[in-house]
Amino acid sequence: MNYLNLVRYQNLFFIALVQILIRYGLFIPFEVDITLSDFNFALLVIATLCIAAAGNIINDIYDVEIDRINKPQKVLIGKKISEQTANNLFIALNVIGVGIGFYLSNSIGKPGFAALFIVFSALLYLYSSYLKGIILLGNLVVSFLVAMSLIMVTLFDLLPAITIENKELQSAVFKVVLYFSFFALALNFIREIVKDLQDINGDKKGGINTLPIAIGRKRTSRIVFVLAALMVFGIIYYMYEYLYNYQVLSLYFLFAIVGPLLFFCVKIWDAKTVKHYALLSKVLKVVMFLGICSIPLFQYVVLE
């Protein structure tokens, strides 16, 4: 169980779920042309999980001192798992992930795509060792990588199968994935800032310069409120523009996504304690989960 917690298995489950839903809840129902066999798709999921798990491990290695302040009960490195073991696991998972990436890239006739796995692995290392100490940049990098976990499915499964004959449908489905990717990026970016609000004490002692440390909790909370409010308006606009005639999907978005985000907006305005921020971080995680779970519902939408 210690090793599962080290790689943050809940987050890995979420990544696997979203990739599976994109293929089997969106691509297959729309009968778009796809490139990967079921086996190779499973390898894509495994490669993504390996890179993500390695990123979680290296982040924990660099964050040991900070985590002893922010969440001492969850520290694993140096207590239940040695740093050497964690480093070996980090290297092994990266080798497996990148190796599978090379195989898949060549199997679809896009050998250059292998570089993506190397770049993602490098970004996760740089994030843990350096980028997370730069205001907002670390938050953006993590959020970008979350969004890319969705886009990777389209790059490897959808893009290579595009032809002149199927271009219109393939592009329409690709657009849906891009919308969800932007949703994941924006929501995760907000959540990363909320986590910075939650971890301000440990980050300050660890020398990490986050937005709450730079401008204070109150101002940061106001910025988060504005970002969340903009996201609410953006989702409502999307519903009006594209889902107006689809009542089931519109109601799902309204109650599962817009409603919780409005609750978040109300609570973040007056949030002051670590418990408040921890709760709000969980709210955003639930919203992201519910948002991703709406992917299969799009099979009932006529894409334009």
Regions found by a protein language model. Name each.
Residues 29-34, 159-169, 241-244:
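Membrane-interface helix termini and inter-helical loops of multi-pass transporters
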